Amino acid sequence: MGQYVLLNGIVLTARDKVHKYLFSKRPDAGAMPFSLEGGVIYHCGPIIRQSPEGARVIAAGPTTSARMQMYEPFIIEHYNVRGIMGKGGMSGAVANAMKESGCVYFHAIGGAGALLAQRIKKVSGVWLLEEFGPAEAMWAFEVEDFPAVVTIDSQGNSMHRQIEDLSRQRLEEILISG
């Protein structure tokens, strides 16, 4: 926990609508163009520019992960996901699912969507574009040296929870001594 990492390989975007779809429809691996098994899901609604040469990512900053946490334990366990990336952390229930499945949470840099887009070398494909539109579709990105920090480790330890606990403790100390 707290390790700075550079991700390389395929990252799949998924926001609210894709999470709800995966949870409610439960498509099997054969029904999806991408495999989630062993993969990384990025909570991101990218800005994509289409051209005759293909899709190019203009911005790809993280979105708040808490909105997806009601679906995430199921998705981690059912699809055997090994990494979730976003911003803001996730609940204790998600951290427990991560512990059970050997998954981690990567915190990406909020407010740096254009900078992060430079680490996306190729758009490999898209799923559910017609149904959900470009921001909510699932995109497959080939990333190179994509920066993030591990803030929930595969043992379920959460840096977010530790900071909350420490902040609460310090606030109590200030209020009592004040």
Give short role names for the model-derived ranges.
Residues 6, 41, 149-151:
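Structured core elements
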Residues 13-146:
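Feature captures the catalytic cores and cofactor-binding loops of soluble hydro-lyases/lyases
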Residues 9, 44-46, 152:
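Pocket-edge structural micro-motifs
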Residues 3-4, 9-10:
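Structural motif
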Residues 72-73, 150-178:
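Active-site/ligand-binding-proximal alpha/beta "capping" segment
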